[in-house]
Structures are given as C-alpha cells and as structure tokens.
Amino acid sequence: MKQHTICPLNDILPETGVCALIDGKQIAIFRTKKNDLFAIDNYDPFSQANVLSRGLIGGTTIVNEAGMDEEVLYVASPIYKQRFNLATGQCLDDVDVTLAAYQVMLNKDTVMLQGV
C-alpha cells in the first residue's frame, strides 16, 4: 500500500483536525490531546459538505458488540452535529452510516497516511 506524507506533526494542533487532499479525495486527520492520530473521510453525508476536519473532538461511552461499555473518541460535524467514531468512521447517531477510516502513523515527526 502506498504511503502519503501529510505534514509535520506540529502542523496539527492537539484537539484539532486538518484536511488533506490525496488523489482527489479529502481526508480529515485529527490529533488528540494525547497525540493519538486518526483519519476518516472529510465528507459529511448529512450536510453533503466536506467539513468534518473542522468538527469538534469529544469522547463518550458506547455499548460494543460484546455488550460491554467502551470509551470512544468521536468528531462531531460542525453542521448538524452527528458524531463519527474516529477509529472506525461509524456514525454514533445513525448506525446505517459509516465513513471510511484510514491508517495514520508517525514517521519521526511526520504524519503519514496509508490505505487511500
């Protein structure tokens, strides 16, 4: 799989997201306050706009498939506020909607994306 260089880690402030254009596709990349990195599609299917990189990062508890409580991080769309799991792209407010999630990693201090 091809890896894409996105930006230096310091270009993404903690608790924010940025948008990267890769082969004509917009990808939202997020950095948490613990410096974890996540990447999902930037397109919000509810507002039909490429805005998720400007959403707010939050956390909540969900019941997973095993019936256990699980802490998840999400991004809330800046338009209609639907929440998307940062790790999986699953919409927490509509189980029928899932965005693509991508593998994001650090190479030294450079953010890299794989799987687009």
Each predicted region: which residue ranges?
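Rieske [2Fe-2S] iron-sulfur-binding domain
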Residues: 19-116
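Zn-dependent metallo-beta-lactamase
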Residues: 1-22
